[in-house]
Amino acid sequence: MQPMTKKKHTTASKRSPARPPSLSPPLESRRRVGGKSPERLHGNAPPTPPRSPLPPSPSPEHTRRLSPQRRRPQRQRKL
């Protein structure tokens, strides 16, 4: 009876830790992709990254970075 309970505990203990690690890699990959995607979305604007991978991304970055600065003074002057 004792060995049986020990085996059950060992199997249960092995199953419990085996489940988190098996779920952790996909979660880590999703977290990594999710962590990188929001940064790229906020930095390069959401619509551009999914449609264009990298080459077109730098141009929208500079154009959009310079455009808000130019638009802001114009808006302030208009106001």
Curated annotation (Swiss-Prot):
Q: What name goes with this protein?
A: Protein B2
What top-level branch of life does the organism fall under?
Viruses
UniProt source species:
Human herpesvirus 6B (strain Z29)
Q: Which residue stretches does the UniProt record annotate as biased composition, category Basic residues?
A: 1-12, 65-79
Q: Where is the composition biased (Pro residues)?
A: 46-59
Q: Which gene encodes it?
A: B2
Q: According to the UniProt record, where is the region Disordered?
A: 1-79
